[in-house]
């Protein structure tokens, strides 16, 4: 890498933090998954907050704990997450609470910490000018094959992420901006839109009805590969329909194994499988099982392919509207700690003393 410095240091990598971009496409025939961000909308908004290209790599942080520090130069960074996430920023030993869904300027030595991701399972962290080597056309981390990211692994304390000189927050300081995520981009919806899958007819009429008319609950078995659901078993057509000759699968495929309980495949999913696929999640709703927490209740809603295409177009419109409505941030985030340390009263006056108004 040329014209770069090691500018962002990972002090604490948290529970599970990786570098991700849009993904690694066109290689599934070689057994290489897409990978990429679980929530592309949050990636695009986080990058816009720091004037990065929409597809630039970001840090995807599951469950919080990530703490990063600007090293020798100021950095412009941002975090997009649920509104109730706990974000702190400032000098390493005196971090104070900050609002989410905005950009921040970190002076050398200052830190930003994603203490908790709140009601969502992850947050997206962007840094202006991030520079990460690509592997097979993408910087996305796929740890099982040591691809992408920094050395193909999860982020670790002590890692340094390079930043382009031209993109650092040097010279005239940029004004941090904030956004308000519309409800649909908060991804708290309980309906997952799906289109009928290639083996929809492997399920009985009762099974098809159960699938689209029952409540399913996100289990604790969720990672970047997929999400298992608990609920009423979905009946296969017969015993022979419970398995198929392994064929191609993609993120969003909904497999129904012999247990009858659905598995929604996510970004790091394998490229082939032998369970019948009753449906495929519409791209607009694919972030839902990756973002929501165990116990969340969903219903699968069958829609047409045209409806699914229109849904992702609507998401893009929401992203563009959110970006167009960015507002400048007030530079100081006053919290209780700051107020307690501040002298808010200078002297004492007598309200009856007319001279006090002079």
Where would I find each of the regions flagged by the language model?
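Conserved "landmark" site that anchors the functional core of diverse proteins
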Residues: 1-358
